Curated annotation (Swiss-Prot):
Protein's name in the database: D-3-phosphoglycerate dehydrogenase 2
Organism: Saccharomyces cerevisiae (strain ATCC 204508 / S288c)
The EC number(s) this enzyme carries: 1.1.1.95, 1.1.1.399
Gene name of the encoded protein: SER33
Superkingdom of origin organism: Eukaryota
Further facts: Present with 2010 molecules/cell in log phase SD medium.
């Protein structure tokens, strides 16, 4: 069999078996007899074509807050220029740095506000190497054609395990006993120390973390209730309750796993603590705004709440250092640290080697796919658009990435510009005021790319344009 004949056979087989790569595609595995008919040098899967952007030189990536080395490797393997910093940057320095970068990677301490993003003249995308994205002005970023990606589940196991440890530690007052013995005090007591078996855990927010926590808790003999604003299938024997009050009334331990939104701000405050069981425990490893800490302090002082574990706070230090967690940062700090059976940790829920490595891979891969292919699946502020990767057989094919205001008539205008060429694939979607069109056009000569770019750049609804070829 000739090489070209094998290629034709491969293409025919891919079409017959529907190897489209699309999410809804159905395929079956080729039989071994078919595989044996192919020469060893022929691959069933075509090699994706490495695309390069028109009118852009080296891709510059700025990584802050000690983003994991797995991300650095992925970016450098792509040939990107990477600038790495272990901590966040002061606002004025960040404004200067962001002027010339195409992508920026941050964690939870860097704030990408409208003031900062106004200076991001080349920025294509933002990677939040964490779950939360409230540190980024998502709406403004979208209005400038900047896609934002995060890691919604890579640290789920690490956070869930931390909460399990805190449940046991609170029930046995391990924090207080450890502090006492560190200072030379031997205090062997059993009063108000409990097994967790048979107790009820109430989970507020049954997402990636809440559901994993549910499974781990049941394995230790806890009964699990959960409250969520949407109906979610329970894992194991966990049971969803219809109101937050019902969960609070019935739970021995209450743990929060919700995002920071206007609806979740001070989700647990004085009325909610009053609704809880006497001697219940509170755990917050989600966002610092969801628990009203002054009200929690009063509930602990009144012996209504027997203890709490907090990993997040309304205001957190910008960097590690002695004395940085103080009353200047949060006015109630001294009062909180003086209370018994209070476990305080410095936002370490996802701080494990495994989680950070996984987050680095997940977010860096998403950013690379968006930069290299225009794939926006997983973006938190942007339409989710994807097309199959181009391959090396498509020599004169250009991928058009056109971000525009979501107004009538845009597709007609764009397709009129592209009509001199064959539009092989096209996908468009919208997200609020922003829409995103991705199209592959063939039979494009190198000399025509600039003309296409300039015509698209003159359209009135344009937010940003990239051409990959």
């Amino acid at each position: 069999m000739s090489y070209s004949a094998a290629d034709n056979l491969q293409d025919s087989f891919q079409r017959a078996m529907n190897f489209s790569g699309s999410p809804g595609a159905v395929s079956t595995s080729p039989t071994q007899s078919f595989m044996n008919t192919l020469p060893r040098r022929v691959s069933i899967t075509k090699q994706p074509k490495a695309l390069k952007p028109f009118s852009t030189g080296d891709m510059n990536i700025l990584l802050l807050e000690n983003v994991n080395a797995t991300a650095i490797k992925i970016f450098k393997d792509q040939g990107y220029q990477v600038e790495f910093h272990k901590s966040s940057l002061p606002e004025d320095e960040l404004i200067e740095k962001i002027k010339d970068v195409h992508a920026i990677g941050i964690r939870s301490k860097t704030r990408l506000t409208e003031k900062i993003l106004q200076h991001a003249r080349n920025l294509v995308c933002i990677g939040c190497f964490c779950i939360g994205t409230n540190q980024v002005d998502l709406k403004y970023a979208a209005s400038k054609g900047i896609a934002v990606f995060n890691s919604p589940f890579s640290n789920s196991r690490s956070v869930a395990e931390l909460v399990i440890g805190e449940i046991i530690s609170l029930a046995r007052q391990l924090g207080d006993r450890s502090i006492e013995l560190h200072t030379g005090t031997w205090n062997k007591v059993a009063a108000r120390c409990w097994e967790v078996r048979g107790k009820t855990l109430g989970i507020i927010g049954y997402g990636h973390i809440g559901s994993q926590l549910s499974v781990l808790a049941e394995a230790m003999g806890l009964h699990v209730l959960y409250y969520d604003i949407v109906t979610i299938m329970a894992l194991g024997t966990a049971r969803q309750v219809s109101t937050l009050d019902e969960l609070l009334n019935k739970s021995d331990f209450v743990t929060l796993h919700v995002p920071a939104t206007p609806e979740t701000e001070k989700m647990l405050s004085a009325p909610q603590f009053a609704a809880m069981k006497d001697g219940a425990y509170v755990i917050n490893a989600s966002r610092g705004t969801v628990v009203d800490i002054p009200s929690l302090i009063q509930a602990v002082k009144a012996n209504k709440i027997a203890g709490a574990a907090l990993d997040v706070y309304p205001h957190e230090p910008a960097k590690n250092g002695e004395g940085s967690f103080n009353d200047e940062l949060n006015s109630w700090t001294s009062e909180l640290v003086s209370l018994p059976n209070i476990i305080l940790t410095p936002h370490i829920g996802g701080s494990t080697e495994e989680a950070q490595s996984s987050i680095g891979i997940e977010v860096a891969t998403a950013l690379s796919k968006y930069i290299n292919e225009g794939n926006s699946v997983g973006s938190v502020n942007f339409p989710e658009v994807s097309l199959k990767s181009l391959d090396y057989d498509q020599e004169n094919t250009v991928r058009v990435l056109y971000i525009h205001r979501n107004v009538p008539g845009v597709l007609k205008t764009v397709n009129d510009i592209l009509s001199d060429h064959n539009i092989e694939k096209q996908f468009s979607d919208s997200h609020g005021e922003i829409a995103y069109l991705m199209a592959d056009i063939s039979s494009v000569n190198q000399s025509e790319i600039k003309d296409i770019y300039e015509k698209l750049n003159q359209t009135s609804a344009k937010v940003s344009i990239r051409l990959l070829y």
